[in-house]
UniProtKB/Swiss-Prot annotation:
A GO-annotated cellular component: chloroplast
Role according to the record: Usually encoded in the trnK tRNA gene intron. Probably assists in splicing its own and other chloroplast group II introns.
GN (gene name): matK
Main subcellular localisation: plastid
Protein family per UniProt: Belongs to the intron maturase 2 family. MatK subfamily.
Lineage top rank: taxon: Eukaryota
Descriptive protein name: Maturase K
A Pfam family this chain is assigned to: Intron_maturas2
GO biological process: mRNA processing; RNA splicing; tRNA processing
Organism: Dalea wrightii
């Protein structure tokens, strides 16, 4: 047990001290509202109406230096609309964003030290691959075809705020910094109860996205570090429940008989007690556990997770919320990056004939296949006003004020991302229907802008090469560029291709 404690404390030994003075540095606020770090592909940039100017920041820092008591109670936050004599919401938001930058410093230094041994090009290549929303499918294809059971786990939240602060204190020892953290949490949440996900977390994440994502990612990182430690130790610990008893009974009296008769049975018996490798994958607020053997071990790990959440994080979770399914009988659904996905293992039979009059050999192979969820995609298109609930294309009035190139570019980007994301599916009939809806919706939007008819616009479309190129299928463009290899390209395009260039969220979510 002492060895395990040392292992758990090893990564926390390099604790960072005295981060609180960074709050008073003007350069930190320049990083917060600078062009480089403010832009994010996941969080929409917040318009502060130039309220975070350097002059206001300098006045805020001066005010903080002159303030004697930095700890503000929850009643003061609720009663007063002025924060240290100024607008509470504005300055609290500015300081919380700077706080997120400051607490990210020690974790960024650890990440940088872990990447020092790699080449720059290799780091960029691997980073772009991991950023891809599509990277989950090659993982499924490589690992899940050999597995039998999968469990989709919802990572429970919210966590009690005091527990979160105590966990953060393991990594950073700076009391003033945690007093400031409690002040922010007092402002947005009720300290004496659990967070209400529908109210407090929603308002907190919208007003302070960087701060919220740091706290949530830190909680997930702490949970995963303990879980992966337990998984690693369970696969390497010496298991003595049955083997020691077996050896004590038969070793002295029948050692020759044991070695000669039971070597294979003895090894197979030990393998039943040894935990196999559990595959773990996390995406957004969920995680996936997959195993090859019987569901008994999956049930064991399910109760491990529940005990970890309840005892260590004080988060209540019911065993019935974690389901264990057999991959051969169930399809696996998940929602990631704004895309609906449905993964299934199909059994394909390969028949081979040795000689003309000889016997046939049938080999059953597992093949990972993705199904295009046509109904959820049509609901998303209807919500974004590209079609009605029945899937009939309609115009997009909000985009009618844009230029022709801007309208076509937006429709093309949405269609290309959806096409690339679901191109790994073997059945593309539903995908062609989605392309048709977007293409006709784009035409109707342009017709609405120019106050014309669909027939007149299609005639114009045939005379303009620029518009014609935008409405040409990608496989048609490839066949025009490489006419001799058109048949090969058609087979390639009809196959299963995983694109690793999808790093942005679904445009249906962003532009709805």
């Amino acid at each position: 047990m002492e060895e395990y404690k040392v292992y758990l404390e090893l990564d926390r030994s390099r604790q960072q001290d005295f981060l609180y003075p960074f709050i008073f540095q003007e350069s930190i606020y320049g990083l917060v509202y600078g062009h480089d770090l403010n832009g994010s592909i996941l969080v929409e940039n917040v318009d502060y109406d130039n309220k975070s100017s350097l002059l206001i920041v300098k006045r805020l820092i001066t005010r903080m230096y002159q303030q004697n008591h930095l700890i503000v109670s929850a009643n003061d936050f609720n009663k007063n609309q002025q924060f240290w004599g100024y607008n509470k919401n504005l300055y609290s938001q500015i300081i919380s964003e700077a706080f997120a930058i400051v607490v990210e410093i020690p974790f960024y230094s650890q990440l940088r030290s872990s990447l020092e041994g790699l080449e720059g090009a290799e780091v960029i290549k691997s980073y772009n691959k991991l950023r891809s929303i599509h990277a989950i499918f090659p993982f499924f294809e490589d690992k899940f075809t050999y597995l039998n059971y999968v469990s989709d786990v919802q990572i429970p939240y919210p966590i009690h705020l005091e527990i979160l602060v105590q966990i953060l204190r393991y990594w950073v020892k700076d009391p003033p910094l945690f007093h400031l953290l409690r002040s922010f949490l007092y402002q947005y949440c009720n300290w004496n109860s659990f967070i209400n996900p529908k109210k407090s977390i929603s308002s907190f994440s919208k007003s302070n996205p960087r701060f919220f994502f740091f706290l949530y990612n830190f909680y997930v990182c702490e949970y995963e570090s303990i879980f992966l430690f337990l998984r690693k130790k369970s696969s390497h610990l010496r298991l003595t429940s049955f083997s020691v008893l077996f050896e004590r009974i038969y070793f002295y009296a029948k050692i020759e008989h044991l070695v000669e008769v039971f070597p294979k049975d003895f090894l197979s018996t030990l393998s039943l007690f040894k935990d196999p490798l559990i595959h773990y994958l996390r995406y957004q607020g969920k995680s996936i556990l997959a195993s090859k053997n019987a569901p008994l071990l999956m049930n064991k790990w399910k109760y491990y997770l529940i005990s970890l959440w309840q005892c260590y994080f004080n988060v209540w979770s019911q065993p019935g919320t974690i389901y264990i399914n057999q991959l051969s009988d169930h399809s696996f659904h998940f929602f990631w990056g704004g895309y609906f996905s449905n993964v299934r293992l199909n059994l394909s039979v390969v028949r081979s004939q040795m000689l003309e009059n000889s016997f046939l050999i049938e080999i059953v192979m597992k093949k990972l296949d993705t199904i295009v969820p046509i109904l959820p995609i049509i609901r998303s298109l209807a919500k974004a006003k590209f079609c009605n609930v029945l899937g009939h294309p309609i115009s997009k009035p909000v985009w009618a004020d844009l230029s022709d190139f801007g309208i076509i570019d937006r429709f093309l980007r949405i269609r290309r991302n959806i096409s690339h994301y679901y191109n790994g599916s073997s059945k593309k009939k539903s995908l062609y229907r989605i392309k048709y809806i977007l293409r006709l919706s784009c035409i109707k939007t342009l017709v609405r802008k120019h106050k014309s008819t669909v027939r007149a616009f299609l005639k114009r479309l045939g005379s303009e090469e620029l518009l014609k190129e935008f409405f040409t299928e990608e496989e048609d463009i490839l066949s025009l560029i490489f006419p001799r290899a058109s048949s090969t390209l058609q087979r390639l395009y009809g196959g299963r291709i995983w694109y690793l260039d999808i790093i942005f969220s679904n445009d249906l979510v962003n532009h709805s």
